[in-house]
């Protein structure tokens, strides 16, 4: 469609030129969250709020196409978007992850990196198996809960923008820090790195798990670990 009739000029133009039987509301929302319309309009929140209106107007236009009515001169590009506050960058990144499964325009770890690197110099991409524990930090990107003979454990994937690693949190520790383990949240982990025969990469077995508040209030104590 774009090659045949030129670039899309607005969300409403996009909706009016597509077969809405093939492109549904969820597809519109995913494209917006991923930034596909950024060159047309930079406010993704307004675009997302206007999806229903765009689809409704497009359906009306399709229904009256060719009839001698006002819809024959259907000017989709002139319909205003619904006003909505622009997303803060953290919100935008979270929405990208909903659509794509990963952060695209930036990485949320950057909001903490300067402070975290003062006492957690270890980047996830640089970790190697060793006996002494590491202190690591990253954003929780994936959480998997497993039942074992020793109770429930969590396998969480931490991501610092440069690398990723799976962290195994045993039942005892998990019980203590369960409320801290949430997707898209920063976590600091003290643990031992070992080779994971199943994935071929490394994984870390958690000894202790900390949230940002604990780290900020006890920086000096963590310098000796890192």
Regions found by a protein language model. Give the residues of each.
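OB-fold (S1/OB) nucleic-acid-binding surfaces
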Residues: 147-172
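Sliding clamp-binding short linear motifs
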Residues: 1-129, 192-194, 199, 203-213, ...
């Amino acid at each position: 469609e774009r090659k045949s009739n030129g670039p899309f000029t607005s969300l409403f133009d996009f909706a009016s030129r597509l077969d809405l039987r093939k492109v549904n509301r969820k597809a519109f929302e995913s494209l917006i969250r991923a930034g596909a319309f950024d060159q047309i309009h930079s406010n993704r929140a307004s675009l997302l709020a206007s999806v229903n209106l765009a689809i409704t107007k497009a359906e009306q236009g399709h229904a009256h196409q060719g009839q001698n009515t006002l819809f024959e001169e259907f000017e989709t590009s002139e319909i205003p978007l619904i006003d909505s506050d622009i997303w803060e960058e953290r919100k935008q990144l979270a929405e990208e992850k909903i659509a794509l499964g990963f952060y695209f325009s930036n990485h949320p770890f950057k909001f903490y990196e300067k402070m975290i690197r003062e006492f957690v110099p270890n980047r996830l991409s640089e970790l190697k198996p060793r006996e002494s524990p590491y202190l690591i930090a990253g954003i929780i990107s994936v959480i998997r809960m497993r039942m074992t003979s020793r109770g429930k454990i969590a396998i969480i994937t931490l991501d610092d923008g440069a690398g990723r690693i799976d962290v195994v949190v045993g039942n005892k520790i998990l019980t203590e820090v369960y409320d801290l383990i949430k997707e898209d949240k920063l976590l600091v982990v003290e643990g031992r790195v070992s080779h994971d025969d199943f994935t071929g990469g490394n994984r870390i077995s958690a000894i202790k798990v900390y949230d940002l508040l604990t780290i900020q209030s006890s920086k000096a104590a963590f310098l000796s670990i890192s």
